[in-house]
Amino acid sequence: RKYFKYYDEISTWQMQHGCMNEHEAFTFYQNSYDFNLEKGLWKDVGEYGGTCDALSADYGVDFKCPTSLDGWLDYIFTGISKQQYNQCQMYMLLFDKPLWKVCAYLTETEWMIQRELSYPVPADKRIILVEVQRNLEWEERLIKNTPFVIEEREKYYQILCDQFGTPSTLIKEQVLITE
């Protein structure tokens, strides 16, 4: 991203489902749990940065829209993934919150809608919440490992420059190609 100034979102149909339904999940949560919930924003803190889904005075929320009933129920029986846990920890660091909530919101997929299928779960029970507490030891490990990660990022960046030229050279070449 730093090199090409381009962010290539990994786009699977599951991620598209989540993006398409995030606003619905936000509105449902806001109306059911916390009228003061606000849309998230981008925040930088030193070398770290991220965009959260939603913020309240004392906590943040990350919305997940699973694409199957089993995937949704996993939030009850197995909790969140390690990746989701790390995401919550990073958001708590960035936004200085003691608590983050993962909100698993069940909504039909496009395939189901086209076939007029519906999950057998009442509309008012379609949220599963998993709470994550801030972990200061996690933050200490992150801070300790950051110099190594930045060093490796810079090596990667240099390899791209060696292979393709500097980013400014790429931009000039793109302009010439499009003219």
For the regions a protein language model found, what residue spans apply to each?
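Accessory terminal regions of nucleic-acid processing enzymes
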Residues: 1-179
